[in-house]
Amino acid sequence: MATTSVSSPKSKPSWVSFLSGGLAGVTAKSAVAPLERVKILYQIKSELYSLNSVYGSMLKIVENEGIKGLWRGNSATILRVFPYAAVQFLSYETIKNHLVADKSSSFQIFLAGSAAGGIAVCATYPLDLLRARLAIEIHKKPTKPHHLLKSTFTKDGVKGIYRGIQPTLIGILPYGGISFSTFEFLKRIAPLNEIDENGQISGTYKLIAGGIAGGVAQTVAYPFDVVRRRVQTHGFGDAKAVVNLEHGTLRTIAHILKEEGILALYKGLSINYVKVIPTASIAFYTYEYLSNFFNKL
């Protein structure tokens, strides 16, 4: 295994990290948008989930809404993901380059990734709320994103457009930290046959490393994602699962465990693996490819 043969990249200009991150996020999320919509629909309902029903759910969406229905809410996703991923990767690179003393320390990289995820969530959360609510409208004409955001703000104010941010932040801290630190660790131990004469790791290895990083991080953070979606969509559209908005994140998790069992906290996880692994692979690979490309301009 190689631990010192990988070339150490120079610090990227801020605009490179920002633009590369945004484009990487949009590319990855758009590719798996149909799976994301089906996952959200399962998370917010109390019925049992089966991976075998994914295909049937997609067919039902196509039957009711047409093929475009599989991408309903993706416009809001793109509006959110570009700034989210841009801010996340920019924050990560900035923190790593200026505050992380030991670039080979997985713990310090974990902290940088966690902080970057938290910053990105706070900056773009209303758009994430918007995406979730658009995704669960399955029996009526789609609401215009800006109309939905305006009506939510008018009805509930700032608190309304940030509903569910607590479990989101609690979940993104381990997710961001684990995904970045795992990806960087896997790059450091890349086999010699995956490294070229210039010290560059192969694209195939980066795709695999990104997928592993996303899968590991998602397993740890997923229960918070379920809570987030339930809080975000409570009383809206086809959301049926019971949730008490007065409860904090941990009390909500305890309530779900009591009423529905531990499997409810992992509802949709199997489809999420199918979604997250290619998403993380594409995002990390595209980011590194584009940042290297832009650095040469």
UniProtKB/Swiss-Prot annotation:
Compartments reported by the entry: Mitochondrion inner membrane
One function term, GO molecular function aspect: coenzyme A transmembrane transporter activity
Protein's membrane topology: Multi-pass membrane protein
Family annotation (Gene3D superfamilies): Mitochondrial carrier domain
Record's keyword annotation contains Transmembrane: yes
Stored SUPFAM superfamilies: Mitochondrial carrier (SSF103506)
Stretches that traverse the bilayer: 15-35, 66-86, 107-127, 165-185, 207-227, 262-282
One GO location term (cellular component): mitochondrial inner membrane
Keywords, ordered alphabetically: Membrane, Mitochondrion, Mitochondrion inner membrane, Repeat, Transmembrane, Transmembrane helix, Transport
Protein name as it appears in the record: Mitochondrial substrate carrier family protein P
Organism phylogeny: Eukaryota, Amoebozoa, Evosea, Eumycetozoa, Dictyostelia
Gene, per the UniProt record: mcfP
